[in-house]
Amino acid sequence: MMHAGDVPLEPVPEVGGDPAPAGRDRQPLPCPSDWTFELIETYHAEIARVARDFGLDTYPVQLEVITAEQMIDAYASVGMPVNYRHWSFGKQFIATEKHYRRGQMGLAYEIVINSDPCIAYLMEENTMTMQALVIAHACYGHNSFFKGNYLFRMWTDAESIIDYLVYARNYVTECEELHGIEAVEALLDSCHALMSQGVDRYRRSQKPSLAEEEVRRKDREAYLQQQVNDLWRTLPKGSDKQVEKSSRRFPPEPEENLLYFIEKHAPLLEPWQREVVRIVRKVAQYFYPQRQTQVMNEGWATFWHYTLLNTLYDEGRLTDGFMIEFLRSHTNVVCQLPVGHPGYSGVNPYALGFAMFSDLKRICENPTLEDRQWFPDLAGSDWRSTLHHAMRNYRDESFIGQFLSPRLMREMRLFSIVDDAAELELEVVAIHDEAGYRRVREALARQHDLSEREPNIQVWNVAVRGDRSLTLRHSRQHDRPLSDDVREVLKHVSRLWGFKVQLESVDSHGKVVQRWEAEPAPH
């Protein structure tokens, strides 16, 4: 648990009146290196006041102060305050701790959880300046994004996630006691290997409470087992029409959510195993929006911590020393290393997101002729409503495709290359000029499209009347083959399915160009 040294703060009382007048005529807040609980509450109240003035809509905030070791523990358990046990979390903890102790990596200043109330963890090693930065960044930046963005509204339920994780931990622990740690661990291994293929991309998720989840689980166990028995029962001989009807492909349409299909239709899974598959699937679904909004989420949080703290400084509430430390940290976060630098690892999502939201504000307040040509509806509009509209209604791919401006492409010196396997050299196909703006923007948007980064694998067919084998089909994107670990992943699929699994890789014409098979290991 990561609750030692908790500082649960009461909701900040409403502060009436207009925003504080401009000008540094107010007494600045004390800014010692060491923080106190009272100072955290004071800074939090000031930041909350300014956030309300800007119209940020957030969940209630709960702050908890934790040690570096507890922060490492939070890393290992994907940032959740409660989780089921699995060896991979311990492995991640040991690796992170080792790198941290050797000075090979630093730790995040905070971890924030998309829940209601929104829980933010502050490291006790932080200075008071860094604690204030974390509060502005996490509690009002990320928090408002979690509450407002359409993907989070569609796919996550902040009110019930903690309850569901408590239920998941208790259920997995109960399964370990009844069926053995090794059996549960092997099942979780296979489910974790398929998490990225275990999400719904188009259907609306359900929002049951903890009590409803318990009742539904018992109903599911009885119903699903009956359905599976009906599906796999030995069928009597029938007429030719009946045989033809039953030999149609199952499922009738390809199924993208592999864990969902296994949960509902795997022939040999016991009810408790189906429930564990469901738990992993629900956790994967919870994190699905975050994988599509990293640039927007981090950019939004960085824009608002910068705006909120600068507003407090302009009001005279922050000292020069505070701002120097804050700006040093902020600059490091939004630093974009150039191509060719030893530390370059691609486009920094913090840098790109912060630059885009800042540029949107500039387009609204001080548009150039070029801005008016590219963004006629945005130029001269109210920047707050424009930024909130962008935050609420886009994900990384569409956000970049819609709002990346020529000016920002020039400032970041963006260009697009093509890496053709048939050619010996890379080709620069577009740069930041009149001829290349749209191609660069489209290329960067595609780079943040999940369908471009993750393989498209769907359930294609089940031999219901034959050997019960499962056939998966991979549709190649830009003729890219699957990675070398495909056989290992297939072993996990066959373990869950219980029978032979085949994977076909097809090209853009539907022709099978590669095929793999895996059989479940004998018990």
What residues fall within each predicted segment?
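Auxiliary, metal-adjacent structural segments of Zn-dependent hydrolase domains
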Residues: H3, V7-L9, P13, P21-G23, ...
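Post-HExxH zinc-binding segment in Zn-dependent metallohydrolases
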Residues: F145-P208, E298, T302-G316, R328-V339
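Fold-level signature of zinc-dependent metallopeptidase catalytic domains
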Residues: P32-I40, L122-E125, M154-D163, E244-R248, ...
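N-terminal accessory alpha/beta regions
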Residues: N83, W87-N114, L165-Y223
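Short pre-active-site segment immediately N-terminal to the catalytic Zn-binding motif
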Residues: C118-V134, P289-T293
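Long, internal scaffold/assembly segments composed of regular secondary structure
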Residues: S246-S345, P349-Y350, F354
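Active-site His/Glu-centered metal-binding helix of metallohydrolases
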Residues: I135-S144, W300
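Non-catalytic terminal regions of proteins
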Residues: C118, E125, T129, F145, ...
